[in-house]
């Protein structure tokens, strides 16, 4: 977890430098003659340079999207209709599952359509909507992962006070604050990005309207965007990760103090799925944005294609793994899934 914390701090620094460098390049271009006709739509480049890969990519992403819908949908239904799951942990898990469905549905369907129809243009308003939902879901997920870590900390380190600290009012409020904060953050970032003038180049070198890719096309000062994104990263990436880090430090200390091997194993099993999701989530973000800049000079086109495939892992594979990890590592979830599928009582 210490490595994850350091990685995220590095991500912040590199992310800010990356956007600032892009702005410097745009500022230099503005000194020349640029077509000042404001763009009314954007063109999503995707993997247009690799037509053979696109076919494989379409089939792969379609299968994964169906798994996301089914897997997370089953977890949501189980958390609602099974009384065994009316607890803070499964309430947060249900929220995370719903978030994963919303997050992927904001970009995957349009990506699939563009791959099969070769229609890659997206309207200005459509890009804004896609950017808003993508950023909102990402921000909310960071907060939810932090809330889930705090839930595990209270359950393991303060079990007697767990019903009091994590009362129904408390955990519903925690989830609501996560959603509201993520939405407000995304609205601010989206409005600041889409208020910028976009002239000349309208090609987004990405599968979706990712905010950093869009900012590169702006032909105006983006200093305010940089400042707000740094603040946003601190609030929605670093702070939740610090909560996760310290929660697991206390959890680890408590587990090591247990005399029973069975108790230690049971305590760790309740955290392993969440910890795995956190490592994948933050690890992928770090790998996407904190790679050494020197690598961009060698095989830039291939590296850009690799970055897009990594973004697939971040945007599709992680939401797909969430229900799988929680189902495989949790007997209650597996029993509930069997109950929903077979409609037989759970013993």
Curated annotation (Swiss-Prot):
One of its GO terms (cellular component) is plasma membrane. Disulfide bonds join 127-219. This is Olfactory receptor 13C3. The keyword tRNA processing does not apply. One of its GO terms (biological process) is detection of chemical stimulus involved in sensory perception of smell. Pfam families: 7tm_4. Glycans are attached at residue 35. Residues 77-84, 151-169, 248-267, 329-347 are cytoplasmic. Keywords: Cell membrane, Disulfide bond, G-protein coupled receptor, Glycoprotein, Membrane, Olfaction, Receptor, Sensory transduction, Transducer, Transmembrane, Transmembrane helix. The keyword Isomerase does not apply. It is found in: Cell membrane. SUPFAM superfamilies: Family A G protein-coupled receptor-like. Odorant receptor. The lineage of its organism: Eukaryota, Metazoa, Chordata, Craniata, Vertebrata. It is a multi-pass membrane protein. Belongs to the G-protein coupled receptor 1 family. The gene is OR13C3.
């Amino acid at each position: 977890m210490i490595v994850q914390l350091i990685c995220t701090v590095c991500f912040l620094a590199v992310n800010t430098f990356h956007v600032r460098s892009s702005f410097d390049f745009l500022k230099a271009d503005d000194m020349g003659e640029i077509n000042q006709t404001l763009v009314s739509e954007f063109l999503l480049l995707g993997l247009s340079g690799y037509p053979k890969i696109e076919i494989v990519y379409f089939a792969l992403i379609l299968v994964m999207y169906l798994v996301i819908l089914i897997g997370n949908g089953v977890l949501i239904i189980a958390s609602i209709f099974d009384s065994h799951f009316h607890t803070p942990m499964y309430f947060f898990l249900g929220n995370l599952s719903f978030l994963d469905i919303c997050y992927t549905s904001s970009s995957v369907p349009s990506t699939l359509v563009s791959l099969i129809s070769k229609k890659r243009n997206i309207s200005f308003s459509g890009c804004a909507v896609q950017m808003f939902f993508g950023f909102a879901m990402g921000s909310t997920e960071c907060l939810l992962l932090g809330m889930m870590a705090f839930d595990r900390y209270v359950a393991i380190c303060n079990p007697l006070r767990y019903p009091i600290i994590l009362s129904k009012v408390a955990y519903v409020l925690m989830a609501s604050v996560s959603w509201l904060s993520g939405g407000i953050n995304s609205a601010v970032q989206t409005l600041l990005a889409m208020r910028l003038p976009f002239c000349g180049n309208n090609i987004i070198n990405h599968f979706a309207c990712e905010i950093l890719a869009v900012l590169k096309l702006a032909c105006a000062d983006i200093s305010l965007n940089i400042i707000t994104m740094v603040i946003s990263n601190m609030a929605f990436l670093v702070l939740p990760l610090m909560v996760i880090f310290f929660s697991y430090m206390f959890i680890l200390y408590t587990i090591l103090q247990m005399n029973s091997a069975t108790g230690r194993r049971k305590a760790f099993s309740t955290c392993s799925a969440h910890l795995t999701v956190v490592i994948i989530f933050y690890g992928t973000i770090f790998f996407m944005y904190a790679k050494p800049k020197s690598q961009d000079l060698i095989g830039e086109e291939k590296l850009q294609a690799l970055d897009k495939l990594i973004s697939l892992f971040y945007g599709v594979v992680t939401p797909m793994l969430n229900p799988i990890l929680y189902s495989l590592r949790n007997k209650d979830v597996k029993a509930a899934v069997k109950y929903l599928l077979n409609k037989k009582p759970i013993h």
